[in-house]
Swiss-Prot record:
It comes from Schizosaccharomyces pombe (strain 972 / ATCC 24843) (Fission yeast). Catalytic component of the NuA4 histone acetyltransferase (HAT) complex which is involved in epigenetic transcriptional activation of selected genes principally by acetylation of nucleosomal histones H4, H3, H2B, H2A and H2A variant H2A.Z. Acetylates histone H4 to form H4K5ac, H4K8ac, H4K12ac and H4K16ac, histone H3 to form H3K14ac, and histone H2A to form H2AK4ac and H2AK7ac. The NuA4 complex is involved in the DNA damage response and is required for chromosome segregation. The NuA4 complex plays a direct role in repair of DNA double-strand breaks (DSBs) through homologous recombination. Residues 87-99 have a biased composition (Basic residues). Its EC number is 2.3.1.48, 2.3.1.-. The gene is mst1. This is Histone acetyltransferase mst1.
Amino acid sequence: MSNDVDDESKIETKSYEAKDIVYKSKVFAFKDGEYRKAEILMIQKRTRGVVYYVHYNDYNKRLDEWITIDNIDLSKGIEYPPPEKPKKAHGKGKSSKRPKAVDRRRSITAPSKTEPSTPSTEKPEPSTPSGESDHGSNAGNESLPLLEEDHKPESLSKEQEVERLRFSGSMVQNPHEIARIRNINKICIGDHEIEPWYFSPYPKEFSEVDIVYICSFCFCYYGSERQFQRHREKCTLQHPPGNEIYRDDYISFFEIDGRKQRTWCRNICLLSKLFLDHKMLYYDVDPFLFYCMCRRDEYGCHLVGYFSKEKESSENYNLACILTLPQYQRHGYGKLLIQFSYELTKREHKHGSPEKPLSDLGLISYRAYWAEQIINLVLGMRTETTIDELANKTSMTTNDVLHTLQALNMLKYYKGQFIICISDGIEQQYERLKNKKRRRINGDLLADWQPPVFHPSQLRFGW
């Protein structure tokens, strides 16, 4: 018995050191007053020591951050990633057998499923965007190359690529591992210093500076304050480079053609990617229009937010990407952008819907807008109505109307048919919102606006 006790006393729990932490391992890092499991996405050696870029489990990516070993509790252990399975290679002279007739028929009739993309460790050749640049470009925006660390994307057939583009237009989900790491520390735009939320494919050298200075009019980017000040002395732009199509006593809207203002539109896409996680930037902005909302002062028109849309959308999308700059969020500008997009859709005599997927904040804003529009219409009607009639009056798609009614639990089955029913709670909540003073888009100020018409050559990607 005593021998067993001696043997147990010799058993020691494994102790870990900082050198045991590897890429993609999981550790317990201090966050919000307690230690939480976090995944190691990058390890860097700096002058002050080794730092780790971590993603906390069940947390949004915008909360990813750099931490030191002092924030990691090694006594709780390290969870290592599973080893990668070796790929099976066919030997020389071996030909794959043809599948049986039954298997061939099954493969034809079965619905196809797209496998999730896996990042490759190979480095692609440097790629540059095609098309001519705008006049007046500078060293800060001559080209927008992908970062060297960018991984080679999966090879897709023409049909798969078209389907992927059609699913999300100008932007798609970014499958690359490098895109999981926020590469810009801080940006300075106007009087505001902002910490970005996500990765954006700015040139590599900008990830090595403390602050990236961005012009609030042309959105050119610089790595030093001196370069930025020299640019401001020469920059003559005081508003977005397009036509002002809407103006009231509060805001203005400018319409910009991506084909005519490539550099400006690319710069605004790079900036917006810092605050959008679910989408990846395409450098060819030719097939898109940009509608920019600005506030005016004695210095010019300052961008508050914008949305882009395809010049021609086969799915009737009236919006490709939407963003309110962080310094202007929670002031009601998002709803103004959404309302303006639907006002344009009404002038086009169409039904519209935003491209999917929406960001988390975008989805919240759209659901609130849809709910307000539908409840307002239903409460104001004295006769029976249908989903198609609601869609026609709001320029929303029938799917969006149906989704909103279901989300609000307004569809009830009564005497063999579905009816629209508003509960007392929803009506009271709507009355409270109605009493709040909020700015709205005046559709009458768009009476002179005509939907732009484009030649087929102006609608294709030019890369």
